[in-house]
């Protein structure tokens, strides 16, 4: 329990009618440390208790008895709490040394499923930086929910259906070279895709031809189906090579095509519930009562179903298959209106579980301030970017530690971790400008900075030949170690806050803060001096390294023991 919750629970014992959340919101940090570590103003209780705030403060101070406080005193209308830093430090360190990497594990989810729709790149297009965000945010959220007792189900809803396959088939039949595509599938398919889109801008017949090929694909035409399957298989091989490098796995690759035979049921359900309305020859669901101006377009006048129909089928399938407690869609900000419609249609269908569905939007990645677009060929491809990040990490490691064992393995952990961390430290709904040099830097608020702090601590522990024991009586009460203790104590609450807000950046910022606090401590403390407090200082080092490593793991980032 962190110090604020400790104080709130002690106050609540004295004033049981006051909600703990209210007490927490009222706690203040005094400007002057001589007035305690935290203070509670008693003004809000004056009306209910019909006493002066000064008397209430005095009553509360007298009744609180806990060995976690050096003293509790009333000063005017305030109750000032002076924490027993040595006692709390000892308690926190013993807990981390006992639990190890399981520290801060919780069972809030009780094993229930969380379906996470994430990554979802388009088949036959390269895996770009644009897909990085959905991949790493989704992967981190899976780790975070797992840590608090849920069972994450990671779903890669592949973009493996749609008119773009008509375009691709037209392009391949016009200019395609089977040998070239087999040798470099994604590169060649991208060239074809960009070329056919450029031609379509000046020649309207290209669009019509693409629509015709897509109609054939929908009708299971053998030639169209064979080409589609080939494009899909080749793309997936390439994607999986990248996922392996990024250390990301999935529980399902059911993409858009998987739901082709499941949309008829959606239409039947909507009809049976009298929700479909005709509008200009199309079938729609009106959603005005949900404050949504535009109706959900379910079926076009030519009989073609739409993206939302497929997502309705997917939502029904996932509910039946996974019986989820939460269903999360990690998809860009630009899809917000679509997901509002999706939830509203399910609500209209009387599916209360639609309340458990959440769109987790994120901002754009730009380059030099410009938006990226595969169609226009203005794109940062992930594979060469990861390779470049690993090379830059390798150069820095060579300069810092030329005799390091497993240099290639460490460079991969640092390079890949740098890209992931930079993405995840950004508030999810904000975008960021892609800057590889800033990402891989060992200075500043970066992944390598946090990894290096962890490796530095491991070096100290090796020198000291430290073996963790939770039976020793650890005691620290200096200012800098206390800052670290407070953060470590707060870690369980930080994880829950990250889960509640679907916000991995909360963990990333916590890790940066902890690394900075440790580096400050390291600069001012002779950790290995043989004196009465050496075992306490080493226990603090061990606890810090444990929490740093676990923070990074929750972000999908490795923490090498040497760098």
From Swiss-Prot:
Gene3D superfamilies xrefs: Arginyl tRNA synthetase N-terminal domain (3.30.1360.70), HUPs (3.40.50.620), Isoleucyl-tRNA Synthetase, Domain 1 (1.10.730.10)
Chief localisation class: cytoplasm
Localization terms from the record: Cytoplasm
InterPro entries, per the entry: Arg-tRNA-ligase (IPR001278), Arg-tRNA-synth_N (IPR005148), Arg-tRNA-synth_N_sf (IPR036695), ArgRS_core (IPR035684), DALR_anticod-bd (IPR008909), Rossmann-like_a/b/a_fold (IPR014729), tRNAsynth_Ia_anticodon-bd (IPR009080)
Catalyzed chemical reaction(s): tRNA(Arg) + L-arginine + ATP = L-arginyl-tRNA(Arg) + AMP + diphosphate
Top-tier EC class: ligase
The protein's Enzyme Commission number: 6.1.1.19
CC annotations in GO: cytoplasm
Motif ('HIGH' region): 121-131
Single annotated GO MF: arginine-tRNA ligase activity
Keyword Cytoplasm among UniProt keywords: yes
UniProt keyword annotations, A-Z: Aminoacyl-tRNA synthetase, ATP-binding, Cytoplasm, Ligase, Nucleotide-binding, Protein biosynthesis
Family indicated by similarity: Belongs to the class-I aminoacyl-tRNA synthetase family.
NCBIfam families given in the database record: argS (TIGR00456)
Quaternary data: Monomer.
Protein's UniProt name: Arginine--tRNA ligase
The organism of origin for this protein: Streptococcus agalactiae serotype Ia (strain ATCC 27591 / A909 / CDC SS700)
Gene symbol of the encoding locus: argS
């Amino acid at each position: 329990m962190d110090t604020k919750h400790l104080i709130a629970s002690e106050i609540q014992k004295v004033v049981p009618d006051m909600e703990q959340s209210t007490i927490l919101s009222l706690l203040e940090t005094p400007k002057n440390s001589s007035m305690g570590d935290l203070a509670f103003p008693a003004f809000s209780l004056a009306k209910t208790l019909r006493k002066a705030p000064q008397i209430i403060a005095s009553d509360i101070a007298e009744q609180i008895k806990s060995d976690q406080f050096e003293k509790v005193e009333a000063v005017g209308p305030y109750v000032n709490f002076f924490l027993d830093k040595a006692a709390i430090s000892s308690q926190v360190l013993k807990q981390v040394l006992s639990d190890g990497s399981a520290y801060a594990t919780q069972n809030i989810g009780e094993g229930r499923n969380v379906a996470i729709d994430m990554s979802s790149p388009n088949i036959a297009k390269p895996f770009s930086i644009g897909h990085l965000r959905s991949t790493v945010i989704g992967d981190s959220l899976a780790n975070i929910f797992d840590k608090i007792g849920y069972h994450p189900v990671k779903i890669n809803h592949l973009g493996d259906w749609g008119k773009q396959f008509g375009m691709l088939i037209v392009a391949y039949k016009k200019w395609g070279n089977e040998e070239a595509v087999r040798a470099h599938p994604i590169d060649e398919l991208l060239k074809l895709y960009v070329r056919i889109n450029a031609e379509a801008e000046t020649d309207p017949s290209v669009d019509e031809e693409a629509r015709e090929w897509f109609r054939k694909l929908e009708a299971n035409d053998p030639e169209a189906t064979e080409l589609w399957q080939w494009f899909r298989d080749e793309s997936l091989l390439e994607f999986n090579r990248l996922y392996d490098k990024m250390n990301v796995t999935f529980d399902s690759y059911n993409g858009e095509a998987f739901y082709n035979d499941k949309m008829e049921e959606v239409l039947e359900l909507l009809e049976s519930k009298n929700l479909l309305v005709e509008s200009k020859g199309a079938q729609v669901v009106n959603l005005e009562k949900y404050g949504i101006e535009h109706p959900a377009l379910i079926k076009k006048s030519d009989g073609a179903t739409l993206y939302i129909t497929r997502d309705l089928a997917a939502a029904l399938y996932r509910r039946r298959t996974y019986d989820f407690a939460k269903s999360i869609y990690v998809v860009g900000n630009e899809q917000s209106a679509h997901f509002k419609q999706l939830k509203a249609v399910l609500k209209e269908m009387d599916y209360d579980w639609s309340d458990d569905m959440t769109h987790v939007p994120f901002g754009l990645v730009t380059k030099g301030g410009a938006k990226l677009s595969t169609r226009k060929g203005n794109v940062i491809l992930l594979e060469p970017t990861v390779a470049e990040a690993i090379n830059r990490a390798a150069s820095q490691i060579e300069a810092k530690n030329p005799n390091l064992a497993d240099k290639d393995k460490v460079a991969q952990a640092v390079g890949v971790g740098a890209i992931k961390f930079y993405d995840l430290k950004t508030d999810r709904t904000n975008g960021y400008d892609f800057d590889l040099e800033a990402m891989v830097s060992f200075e500043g608020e970066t992944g390598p900075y946090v990894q290096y702090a962890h490796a530095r601590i491991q070096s100290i522990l090796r020198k000291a030949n430290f073996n963790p024991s939770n039976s020793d009586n650890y005691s620290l009460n200096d200012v800098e170690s206390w800052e670290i203790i407070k953060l470590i104590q707060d870690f369980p609450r930080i994880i829950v806050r990250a889960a509640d807000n679907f916000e991995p950046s909360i963990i990333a910022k916590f890790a940066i803060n902890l690394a900075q606090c440790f580096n400050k401590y390291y600069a001012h403390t002779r950790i290995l001096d043989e004196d009465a407090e050496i075992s306490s200082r080493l226990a603090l080092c061990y606890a810090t390294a444990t929490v740093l490593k676990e923070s990074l793991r929750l972000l999908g980032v490795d923490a090498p023991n040497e760098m």
